[in-house]
């Protein structure tokens, strides 16, 4: 056959690969992009566990952890909107840059259909009481607003993103 020529090949269609492709498109890179993923497109990912009530160790790969959007497609879809949780990103790139990056990623989820409601904000008095109890117990309470996508909604959002990438010339 005819050899295919790409400017950029993205290995893996998890969140990092997805956002890389979105950024290339939006920054006007004008590149021919191929995204390689060993799993299925989001709309073809099915887990037999819902029928069998047990994991059957699917071969060659698990449809829950592998495929477009990675394991996130079948989680409960919670996005932590604070750099206070989830790793060392603030130490690596600075707190303000980490917060701006989280807000930017969140704006993309909103654009593709995420609910605008954010959990964990607007209950300052209750949080203040819980914080006092945590301190007394030797704990540190971390405020972390959460955008809850929900499992079904997460799949809809990732499907919309997948279609956006395809419509913008990304080969998968």
Model-derived features: positions:
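Structural motif
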Residues: 9, 32-34, 71, 171
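Gly/Ala-rich phosphate-binding loop of Rossmann-like dinucleotide-binding domains
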Residues: 21, 25
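Beta1/beta-strand and adjacent pyrophosphate-binding region of the FAD-binding site
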Residues: 4-16, 34-36
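Conserved S-adenosyl-L-methionine
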Residues: 26-31
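Conserved N-terminal/central alpha/beta ligand/cofactor-binding core
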Residues: 38-169
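Generic N-terminal leader segments that precede the first folded domain
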Residues: 10, 15-18, 41, 49
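Short, intrinsically disordered, charge-balanced linker/junction segments flanking boundaries
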Residues: 1-3, 168-172
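Conserved structural-core and active-site-/substrate-pathway-adjacent residues in large, well-folded domains
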Residues: 10-12, 20, 77, 161
């Amino acid at each position: 056959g005819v050899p295919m020529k790409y400017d950029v090949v993205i290995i893996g269609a998890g969140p990092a690969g997805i956002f890389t492709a979105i950024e290339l498109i939006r920054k006007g890179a004008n590149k021919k992009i191929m995204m390689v993923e060993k799993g299925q497109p989001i709309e073809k990912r099915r887990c037999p566990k819902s029928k069998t009530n047990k994991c059957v160790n699917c071969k060659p790969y698990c449809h829950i952890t592998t495929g477009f959007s990675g394991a996130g497609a079948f989680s409960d879809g919670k996005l932590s909107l604070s750099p206070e949780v989830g790793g060392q990103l603030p130490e690596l790139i600075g707190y303000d840059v980490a917060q701006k990056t989280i807000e930017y990623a969140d704006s993309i989820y909103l654009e593709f259909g995420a609910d605008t409601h954010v959990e964990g904000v607007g209950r300052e008095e209750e949080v203040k009481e819980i914080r006092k109890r945590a301190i007394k117990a030797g704990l540190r309470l971390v405020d972390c607003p959460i955008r809850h996508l929900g499992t079904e909604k997460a799949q809809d959002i990732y499907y919309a993103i997948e279609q956006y990438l395809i419509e913008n010339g990304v080969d998968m």
